[in-house]
């Protein structure tokens, strides 16, 4: 059953592609919470996560392993762990990945050991991953909190992808086709947030993961 966030601000208009759901989560437990954030390429997952971690640096963002070549601004162990295809396949064979998927000709995966180490230490862990990986996590860790980040419309998503200026026309078409499939899968997630406005989406995500305590509410004027 999907839920979404109850916000004191006026709700964001929801496109025909997404159905925003509302609700809230229990507070952190002695064992950390595993949070899975998924959404189409270009929807703004990375920007939203960076903003959230600026406010909550205690939230551990899992660093993925990939066979994709590093971009000029990317650092080993910060943005990704960059590995050869052979090394990645060895990680799969050794069952060292919590999830893995192939996207645009490259492999991506989540190291298993560090995720469960952080969870056992009581730290919340965030996975920013694709749909195929989110489905694998659901099978292996059914208690994971699954959040789908949705664009206000496919037209707006296309505009954002084109604005980045990183993709060929063929690549843009592939990304949009994949986005349509991912939007069809939003019912698989516990919560849906529409990223029409970054600040509002951030407030909604923050309210979901870090709801104010009853005592703090009582202290408000």
From Swiss-Prot:
EC number: 2.7.4.8
Pfam families, alphabetized: Guanylate_kin
Gene from which this protein is expressed: gmk
Pathway info: Purine metabolism
Keyword Disulfide bond: no
GO cellular component annotations of the record: cytosol
Residues given in the record as ATP binding sites: 39-46
Name by which UniProt lists this protein: Guanylate kinase
Disordered: region residues: 1-32
Function statement: Essential for recycling GMP and indirectly, cGMP. (Microbial infection) Catalyzes the phosphorylation of dZMP to dZDP, when the bacterium is infected by a phage that produces the substrate for the synthesis of dZTP (2- amino-2'-deoxyadenosine 5'-triphosphate), which is then used by the phage as a DNA polymerase substrate.
Organism: Synechococcus sp. (strain JA-2-3B'a(2-13))
Family: Belongs to the guanylate kinase family.
CDD domains: GMPK
Reactions it catalyzes: GMP + ATP = GDP + ADP; dZMP + ATP = dZDP + ADP
Biased composition regions of type Polar residues, renumbered to the chain: 1-24
Extent of the signal sequence: none
PANTHER family recorded: GUANYLATE KINASE (PTHR23117:SF13), GUANYLATE KINASE-RELATED (PTHR23117)
Subcellular localization, as worded in the UniProt entry: Cytoplasm
């Amino acid at each position: 059953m999907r839920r979404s966030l109850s916000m004191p601000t006026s709700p964001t208009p929801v496109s025909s592609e997404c159905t925003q759901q509302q609700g809230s989560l229990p507070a952190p437990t002695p064992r950390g919470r595993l949070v899975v954030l998924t959404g189409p390429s270009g929807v703004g997952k990375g920007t939203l996560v960076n903003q959230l971690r600026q406010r909550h640096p205690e939230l551990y963002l899992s660093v993925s392993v990939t066979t994709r070549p590093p971009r000029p601004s990317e650092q080993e162990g910060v943005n990704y762990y960059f590995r050869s295809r052979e090394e990645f396949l060895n990680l799969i064979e050794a069952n060292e990945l919590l999830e893995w998927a192939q996207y645009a000709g490259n492999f991506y995966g989540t190291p298993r050991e560090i995720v469960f180490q952080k969870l056992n230490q009581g730290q919340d862990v965030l996975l920013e991953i694709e749909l195929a990986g989110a489905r694998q996590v659901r099978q292996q860790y059914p208690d994971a909190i699954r959040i789908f980040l949705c664009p206000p419309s496919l037209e707006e998503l296309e505009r954002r992808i084109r604005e980045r200026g990183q993709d060929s026309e063929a690549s843009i078409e592939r990304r949009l086709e994949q986005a349509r499939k991912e939007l069809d899968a939003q019912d698989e997630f516990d919560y849906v947030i529409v990223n029409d406005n970054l600040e509002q989406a951030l407030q909604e995500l923050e309210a979901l993961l870090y709801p104010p305590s009853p005592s703090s509410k009582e202290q408000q004027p």
